[in-house]
Amino acid sequence: MELNSLTAISPIDGRYSNSTKLLRNIFSEFGFLKYRLYVEIQWLKKLINMHQILEIKKVEKTDILFLDNIFETFNEEDAISVKNIEKETNHDVKALEYFLRKKLSQSKKLSPFLEFVHFLCTSEDINNIAYALMIKNARDEIILPLWKKIINFLKNASFQYRNNSLLSLTHGQPATPSTMGKEMVNFYYRMQRQYHKLKKIEILGKINGTTGNYNAHLVAYPKVNWHAVSKEFITSLGIFWNPYTTQIEPHDYIAELFGCVSLFNNILIDSNRDIWGYISLNYFKQKLIDQEIGSSIMPHKINPIDFENSEGNLGLSNALMNHMINKLPISRWQRDLSDSTVLRNIGVVFAYSIIAYNSVLLGTNKLTINTSQLLKNLDNNWSVLSEAIQTVMRRYTIENAYEKLKKLTRGKKIEKVDIHKFIDKLNIPKIEKERLKKISPSNYIGAASQIIDEIK
C-alpha cells in the first residue's frame, strides 16, 4: 500500500497533513539527513580554512561552491542512496559520511581530502548540531509566527470587546462583572510572556569529540586550541556553544524550550475552554457555514469543534513534551542511546501543537460577540452588586455590613428594585445613595476597560 494521507498510520501525516507539511523539510528522515549533511559540510569547510592543518592544500572558491552544491541539490534520490548505504553499515551517520566521500571523489581538487570528512567527529557532534538547527528553524519559522497570530487575535479582541460587560463566574457561580475584552487580555498577557521567553531561549550545540575532551583532536594536532575552534564553529551556525559536555549535548535547552511551549499550550487550553464555555452560554455566536454539518443526526448543531480539536491535540503534544522534559536531560555516564529514539519524535511534538494552533485560529475567525445575551445575563444577576454596597457601608462604619448583604442576597433572586430599596434605608450620605443607585451589573466593571490601554 502506497504511503499517502489516506494510508498514513498517524493523523499527523494523514488527516492533518495540510497543517503539518511545513515540518516535513525539517523533521522527516529526509530533513534530518539534509541537516546532518549541512553540518558535515560546514565542518569540512572549517577544517579547510584552518591554516594549522597543513595536509589540506589551498582550495579554490569553485571547490567550496562544489561542496555547497552537494547540500543545496540534496534530493530524495540522494537520501535513498544514503539509506541504501546504511543497510550495509547499520549506522546512519557513517552512511552519510560515505555518501559525502563518494560525492567529493568526483572533484579532482577535493578528492585528496576524503579522510577529512567527519574528521575528529563522533556521531553526536553531527547529530546534536543538526537537531539544534532543526529546532531553531521550527521555532523561528513556524512556532513563533503561529503564536503571534494567536496573540494578535487576543490583543485585537481585548480592544474590540473592551466595553462588552460580562457576568463573571467564580466556582461556576455569578461573581463581580468584568468585560470580555479584559478576559481576553488576561490570556494575551500570559501568552505574550511565553512568546518573549521562547525567543530568548539559547539553543545549544557542541563539537568536542567522543567524551567532550578533544582527545583525538589533540593527538592529531596538539598545538591547535580546539576549545576555541569548537566555539567559533558552533556560534558561526547561529546557535550557542555548550563548552562542557559528555559525548552528547545534554539536552537541557530542549527541556527548557519544551517547558516554555508546554506552558503556552496549557494557557491556550485554558483559553480554549473559556471560549468554549462562552459559546455554550451564547456569549459568542459562531458564523454559520451552509455546507458544514454539526451532527450526523441533529441538523441544528453548530459545535465549537475547532476549540475542542485544539484542546485534544495540545494534550497530546504536552504529554510527549513532558516525557522529553523528564527523559532527555538524563543519560548514563558519558552517554547511552535511549535519547536517540526520543529525539526522533521532536517533530511529532511540534506537529501536534501546530495542528492545535491552526485549529484554534480557525475557531477564532468564526466568533461574533452576542451583546444582548451578555446584557441579559447581567440583568438577571443584580445580587453581584452586594460586594459594592457592603464595601461602601463598611467605609461608613456600618456594623455587620457584610452580614446584612448576605441576608438580603444569598441564595435569592434579587431584582433592581430590591437593591434600591435596601440602599434607601442605609444611613449614608445622600450623594452616596445616588452613586450606588447608578451602579448596575453592566457598569460595575471597575477599571476593566481602562487597564487594557496599558498592553503593548
Curated annotation (Swiss-Prot):
<comment type="pathway">
    <text>Purine metabolism; IMP biosynthesis via de novo pathway; 5-amino-1-(5-phospho-D-ribosyl)imidazole-4-carboxamide from 5-amino-1-(5-phospho-D-ribosyl)imidazole-4-carboxylate: step 2/2.</text>
</comment>
<dbReference type="GO" id="GO:0005829">
    <property type="term" value="C:cytosol"/>
</dbReference>
<feature type="binding site">
    <location>
        <begin position="90"/>
        <end position="92"/>
    </location>
    <ligand>
        <name>N(6)-(1,2-dicarboxyethyl)-AMP</name>
    </ligand>
</feature>
<comment type="function">
    <text>Catalyzes two reactions in de novo purine nucleotide biosynthesis. Catalyzes the breakdown of 5-aminoimidazole- (N-succinylocarboxamide) ribotide (SAICAR or 2-[5-amino-1-(5-phospho-beta-D-ribosyl)imidazole-4-carboxamido]succinate) to 5-aminoimidazole-4-carboxamide ribotide (AICAR or 5-amino-1-(5-phospho-beta-D-ribosyl)imidazole-4-carboxamide) and fumarate, and of adenylosuccinate (ADS or N(6)-(1,2-dicarboxyethyl)-AMP) to adenosine monophosphate (AMP) and fumarate.</text>
</comment>
<dbReference type="Pfam" id="PF08328">
    <property type="entry name" value="ASL_C"/>
</dbReference>
<feature type="active site" description="Proton donor/acceptor">
    <location>
        <position position="171"/>
    </location>
</feature>
<keyword id="KW-0658">Purine biosynthesis</keyword>
<dbReference type="InterPro" id="IPR024083">
    <property type="entry name" value="Fumarase/histidase_N"/>
</dbReference>
<dbReference type="InterPro" id="IPR000362">
    <property type="entry name" value="Fumarate_lyase_fam"/>
</dbReference>
<dbReference type="InterPro" id="IPR008948">
    <property type="entry name" value="L-Aspartase-like"/>
</dbReference>
<feature type="binding site">
    <location>
        <begin position="122"/>
        <end position="123"/>
    </location>
    <ligand>
        <name>N(6)-(1,2-dicarboxyethyl)-AMP</name>
    </ligand>
</feature>
<feature type="binding site">
    <location>
        <position position="309"/>
    </location>
    <ligand>
        <name>N(6)-(1,2-dicarboxyethyl)-AMP</name>
    </ligand>
</feature>
<dbReference type="InterPro" id="IPR020557">
    <property type="entry name" value="Fumarate_lyase_CS"/>
</dbReference>
<dbReference type="InterPro" id="IPR004769">
    <property type="entry name" value="Pur_lyase"/>
</dbReference>
<dbReference type="InterPro" id="IPR047136">
    <property type="entry name" value="PurB_bact"/>
</dbReference>
<keyword id="KW-0456">Lyase</keyword>
<dbReference type="GO" id="GO:0070626">
    <property type="term" value="F:(S)-2-(5-amino-1-(5-phospho-D-ribosyl)imidazole-4-carboxamido) succinate lyase (fumarate-forming) activity"/>
</dbReference>
<protein>
    <recommendedName>
        <fullName>Adenylosuccinate lyase</fullName>
        <ecNumber>4.3.2.2</ecNumber>
    </recommendedName>
</protein>
<dbReference type="GO" id="GO:0004018">
    <property type="term" value="F:N6-(1,2-dicarboxyethyl)AMP AMP-lyase (fumarate-forming) activity"/>
</dbReference>
<comment type="pathway">
    <text>Purine metabolism; AMP biosynthesis via de novo pathway; AMP from IMP: step 2/2.</text>
</comment>
<dbReference type="GO" id="GO:0006189">
    <property type="term" value="P:'de novo' IMP biosynthetic process"/>
</dbReference>
<feature type="binding site">
    <location>
        <position position="247"/>
    </location>
    <ligand>
        <name>N(6)-(1,2-dicarboxyethyl)-AMP</name>
    </ligand>
</feature>
<feature type="binding site">
    <location>
        <begin position="301"/>
        <end position="303"/>
    </location>
    <ligand>
        <name>N(6)-(1,2-dicarboxyethyl)-AMP</name>
    </ligand>
</feature>
<dbReference type="InterPro" id="IPR013539">
    <property type="entry name" value="PurB_C"/>
</dbReference>
<feature type="binding site">
    <location>
        <begin position="340"/>
        <end position="344"/>
    </location>
    <ligand>
        <name>N(6)-(1,2-dicarboxyethyl)-AMP</name>
    </ligand>
</feature>
<feature type="binding site">
    <location>
        <position position="335"/>
    </location>
    <ligand>
        <name>N(6)-(1,2-dicarboxyethyl)-AMP</name>
    </ligand>
</feature>
<feature type="active site" description="Proton donor/acceptor">
    <location>
        <position position="295"/>
    </location>
</feature>
<dbReference type="InterPro" id="IPR022761">
    <property type="entry name" value="Fumarate_lyase_N"/>
</dbReference>
<dbReference type="GO" id="GO:0044208">
    <property type="term" value="P:'de novo' AMP biosynthetic process"/>
</dbReference>
<feature type="binding site">
    <location>
        <position position="296"/>
    </location>
    <ligand>
        <name>N(6)-(1,2-dicarboxyethyl)-AMP</name>
    </ligand>
</feature>
<feature type="binding site">
    <location>
        <begin position="15"/>
        <end position="16"/>
    </location>
    <ligand>
        <name>N(6)-(1,2-dicarboxyethyl)-AMP</name>
    </ligand>
</feature>
<comment type="similarity">
    <text>Belongs to the lyase 1 family. Adenylosuccinate lyase subfamily.</text>
</comment>
<dbReference type="Pfam" id="PF00206">
    <property type="entry name" value="Lyase_1"/>
</dbReference>
<comment type="subunit">
    <text>Homotetramer. Residues from neighboring subunits contribute catalytic and substrate-binding residues to each active site.</text>
</comment>
